[in-house]
A protein has these predicted regions:
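Cyclophilin-like peptidyl-prolyl cis-trans isomerases
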Residues: 1-198
Length: 198
């Protein structure tokens, strides 16, 4: 368990705005420092505000965070982290911003348990940018462990994640009615006293 965590609130709307709710996420900077820094920067930049969850699969996960294209083909890291679409042999000057990615931290011992947040990427290593996915309460996709990086957990509102995972979808697992991430807000950091870990 991490001694210091960062708290982010996601305001969500789905079913044509008929349903709404807040999902609170506790990020783990000790376990996944680069993922947390990147996610926090994207939140603080307002990049996630007004985006959609473009890929929703019941009993599995809901995926969003493509703030450039809104369909899973776009998004990128908040700043230069040394990787250009997974390649760390390219200089920042030779990499377009829309190809900025972050290194995997998937060996951090955190598993894809219900109500966790993990980073989306291609099948190639170190290709996470801004897309992320939330795991509903009825899903434990263990085959992602050690491949995708878990960097936090949903501490409140996982019922909303689970409800959204069951919405009607069309081609490419895209919801028929938009599932909107209205706003993402960095609430602050919390430090837990050491004795809570014993």
């Amino acid at each position: 368990a991490d001694t210091t965590t960062d708290i982010v609130d996601l305001q969500l709307k789905w079913n044509g705005g008929a349903n709404s709710g807040t999902v609170t996420i506790e990020l783990y900077p000790d376990s996944a420092p680069i993922h947390v820094e990147n996610f926090k920067l994207l939140v603080q930049n307002g990049d996630y505000d007004g985006t959609v969850f473009h890929r929703v699969i019941d009993d599995f996960m809901i995926q969003g965070g493509d703030f450039t294209n809104g369909d899973g083909t776009g998004g990128h890291a908040a700043k230069w982290f040394g990787y250009c679409n997974g390649d760390n042999g390219v200089s920042e000057a030779d990499c377009q911003q829309d190809r900025y990615t972050i290194p995997d931290e998937a060996d951090n011992g955190l598993d894809h348990e219900p109500c966790t947040i993990s980073m989306a990427k291609t099948s190639a290593p170190h290709t996470g940018g801004s897309q992320f996915f939330l795991i509903p309460s009825d899903s434990t996709p263990t085959w992602l462990d050690g491949v995708h990086t878990v960097f936090g957990e949903v501490t409140s509102g996982c019922n909303h994640v689970t409800a959204i995972s069951g919405v009607e979808t069309g081609s490419n697992d895209r919801p028929v009615q938009n599932v909107e991430l209205v706003s993402a807000t960095f609430v602050g950091s919390e430090t837990k006293p050491w004795y809570e870990f014993w």
